[in-house]
Amino acid sequence: MLRYELRGAAVLALVLALAGCGKKVDDAAPLAFVPADTPYVIANSEPLPDATSQRFAQQMKVAWPFMLDSIDHALAELGKDDPQSAAMRPVRALLDEVRERDTPEKWQQIGLGSKVRSAIYGVGLLPVVRIELVDVDAFRAMIARVEQKAGAKLTTAKIGTQDVWTFGNEAVLGLMAIEDKHFVLTAVPAAADEALKRRVLGLDRPAQSLAASGALAELDKTQGYLPYGSGWIDVRCTLALLIDDPSVAAFARGFGAPSPTFEPACRADFERIAANAPRLSFGYSTLDAERMAFKGRLELAPAIAQALARITTAPPGPPAGKDSFLDFGITLPLLKARDFWVEQAGAVAKAPFQCGALAPLNETFAEAREKLDQSVPPPMSDFSGLRVTISHFGWPDGAAKPDVSGIVLLGSSNPGFLINLAQLSVPALRDMKLGTDGKPVALPRGTLPAEMAGDLDVHAAMNPSALGVAVGKDEAARLGAALAAPAAAGGVLLDASYSGEIYTAFSQMIGRFADVIPAEQRQQLESQRKLYAFYATWFKRFDARVTVGNDGVDFIESVEFAKP
């Protein structure tokens, strides 16, 4: 019998060995320094593709001067009491070093590249930034020039054989180092021992790295993220570390605050909270020269996800076409939303948190339940959603008001009641007949104040689930089509879309109101105006969507770039 067990163990060992041979880990990659159990991480495990990198480089070259203007303004505000303070001098010296670097080639002259791998992650709760350098000597030379211009050298120390730069105060110690071809920046409690410093700097590697575990690669595969910027915040791990990570108490002592104390009940309560929303993950799903899409998922406990899905239908009307100036829809089922939150507050009331640190949370839920657990009168109780579509927006020179056309849809289980209220409030509407057939009817003269109405075409229409208003020429037909369209699929909390032309409008409005803006703000706003004007040439379309599914809430944002 023992012989067969040994033979089975040998076969298992061989299989594991072969599996290990098939999975080669790059020990020089930033992910090889990230602990597999890190509570948070965002990393690009592969460099950007050439086409994407070139697109970003073109945009950066134009935007860089305006970004510098904003930074200069912020620094002027921070240092207005003492612009030559010891703290401000190195910051200004660093800014001078990068001021003219508006192309990838110029950044490479100081050792930084656009096609490198990097990671931001936690060793415990302590943050670490790790970036590949393209030229270590050039980076060191840049730091030397910054020191010379600032008139002071950075404080240095040795951790083992590793040279580090240090900075900070009596509570926080910043560490900066060049390790092989990596630039590493981190922070620890000022009283941290050498063992902790070695861990955060990666001089002592984690027992298992994220590269070896493959967890980030698996996340990318499961969620459809690209390897150019993805990661997570692990809520369960983060809350557990508030109790277990000694750095929390060390920072508190450094700042002269009492060390937080967590009784045994806190661990169970933190786990209970984390079980409801265990993780937020995020990453690019598209990233090329034509389009960029970013997705985030807040994972939820199945019971909460299902309860949230039950109240999530869809905003009224279909999303507008890609030719709209702006389209925004949101689900607003007030009664169902109230019931959802009353249910959540009731769960806390039934089983209050026992952790002393969470006592305010018990009080908050109790107060919320008391305020929410009341009758909601119509028309508020009838609301189900809202959609605003602006088809056209312009503000011609010399015009007193903008030229706007579009439609508004208000979802309601009783839209006729809204019409009745409007007729009671506005005498001009009393004789208007509006059926539930979705056919637009022109609003009578006198409905709107003369200064607002002008020569506007204003129509209203209604179906059994929504009331709509159209403003502008040809918008009545659009309103009728929106009300006649089939109901959209459920599960949508919010959808939004807008044209890159919105930045042209922002730029024009800043210019239009320049005379009434305080003089000290005009220079900064002028830079912002120019930047908006450039945005209008870069971006063709923005789309955003928030949906609820069985696994949680998804946030999706996409950008279509304008053709150069």
Locate each region found by the language model:
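Bacterial N-terminal signal peptides that target proteins for export
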Residues: 1-10
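Single conserved position on a long alpha-helix in the C-terminal lobe of the eukaryotic protein kinase
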Residues: 42, 92, 96-218, 381-492
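Active-site proximal loops enriched in glycine and acidic residues that flank catalytic Cys/His/Asp
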Residues: 296-298, 330-332, 410-412, 462-464, ...
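Structural boundary/hinge residues at secondary-structure and domain interfaces
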Residues: 21-166, 215-279, 293-397, 426-429, ...
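Bacterial N-terminal signal peptides
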Residues: 9-17
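Long, C-terminal catalytic modules of enzymes
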Residues: 472-476, 483-564
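Membrane-proximal interfacial segments on either side of biological membranes
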Residues: 244, 334-340, 417-420, 502-513
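Signature of lipid phosphatidyltransferase scaffolds
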Residues: 204-207, 220, 224-231, 495-496, ...
